[in-house]
Amino acid sequence: MKPTHIEHLGIAVTSIEEAAPFFEFLSGNKCYSIEVVEDQKVRTAFFKVGEVKSELLEPTSPESTIAKFIEKNGGRGGVHHVAFNVENVAEALAECEAAGIQLIDKAPRKGAENLMIAFLHPKSTKGVLTELCQQPA
């Protein structure tokens, strides 16, 4: 597996509306995309800094993994994951599994911005929740 670049940093927030002004100031750019990813129970907002994106993640349900992350983090949110772009998520997952890395997702699934995504378990990635992303065809 050879990632081409860091695709984005995922940042959990309690409210995109409250967090967006800070990230607009920090990045020097306006948010360019907001969408809801129903199956992940999350609302996302993207900001670009150079070639790397920041993805704000707001829970849409108290049962979402983002809501649970925020709760575990004292209600404050924070850095949730690092995402790497790969040419083929399915192949990258197979390589990771063969290398003994614990997978959260056994197969790619659709994420925000029409990316195909899969997560690697932090127990196998030195404590960092890691996402693999494949650009849409």
Which residues are covered by each model-predicted region?
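Vicinal oxygen chelate
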Residues: 1-2, 13-21, 26, 35, 45-48, 55, 61-63, 74-123, ...
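Long, hydrophobic N-terminal alpha-helical segment
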Residues: 1-40
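Residues embedded in well-ordered beta-strands within globular domains across many folds
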Residues: 7-10, 83, 133
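Extracellular/lumenal glycan-associated surfaces
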Residues: 28, 52-55, 81, 133
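Short connector loops at helix/strand junctions that flank enzyme active sites
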Residues: 42, 49-51, 74-79
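Short, conserved turn/kink motifs that form compact alpha/beta structural patches or helix kinks used as
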Residues: 53, 59-64
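Regulatory and interaction patches adjacent to catalytic/ligand-binding sites
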Residues: 67-73
